[in-house]
Amino acid sequence: ELACLHWIERNTPELDADATARRELRARLSSVRQSLFENLGRVFMPSHEGTNRCRWFWRGKEVKLTSVRGLNELLSNVCDDVYHHTPSWRNELVNRREVSSSAAKARRNLIEAMIEHVAEEALGIHGTPPERSMYDSLLRSTGLHRRAGEKWAFCPPGRKAEDAMTAIWKAVGDFLHESEQGPLSVSQLFALLVRAPFGLKYGVLPILLAVVLLHFDTEIALYLEGTFVPVVSTPIFERIIRSPEKFAVQRCRIAGPRAVVFDRYASMLSSGASAVQQVKPKLLSIARPLFRLTTQLPEYVTKTQQLSGPATNVLRAIKEATQ
């Protein structure tokens, strides 16, 4: 019943316009969750007399438990063993399965700063708003955002980052490598990071995804229900948070002789850019400007019959492209 209620919460957009239904759903969730915990407690917890209705086994051996403390120690040791790549992010605002409305607002502000002020120290966040504590614990302390040359940038975990963070980055890299064969759902990536041995909380996943998309900006294509998303923005991330299953990512890398051709195209399209912006052009350095160009054309240009054959074919190919 609890799983069904969570499904309704995630997949019923009509709730956004029905405050009464939202209150009823929250009340039902609270009641069912409390009932579940009480029943689990009666089954699992040793009684005051030291008896237990359960027999506990770990690694094939029975563990005798005579107290609640003993059970807690066992569960703690089991969790440490199973989730051995869980990072120790000390931020109770966002390192949670469900975040509060105020924490969600701070996370939104942080993601907006990540997108708009990536090259600035502390992402241009001044003072001590809640998003600054999120930044310090999740991005700065791990080295995911650090100085790279004259500017700040998103990077792989730093040398001082804990092993768990390095393992998470490798898992994300393996996922992206697999996506080269075809787009993979963002919800699949989130499910991977929630499972053992990582055990990440859902609250931090959008922030980690933002790091990945911004670090691999010219290599990862983002799709919304099969349609290419040319610009990663804060509103897009708000939709990802609500419906990650509607989004997919694909890593796009070109090697060999074709890479030379793509580099030439990229140089032509970025002829007005600075030298820094023209370093190591990638496939998406071409795709994004072309996509933006075609979507911004006046309607009469897209419907006229006066275009040359090659120009018409290019427009049609870009419009109909799914990858």
Predicted regions and their residues:
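Extended alpha-helical scaffold and adjacent linker segments that couple domains
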Residues: 1-323
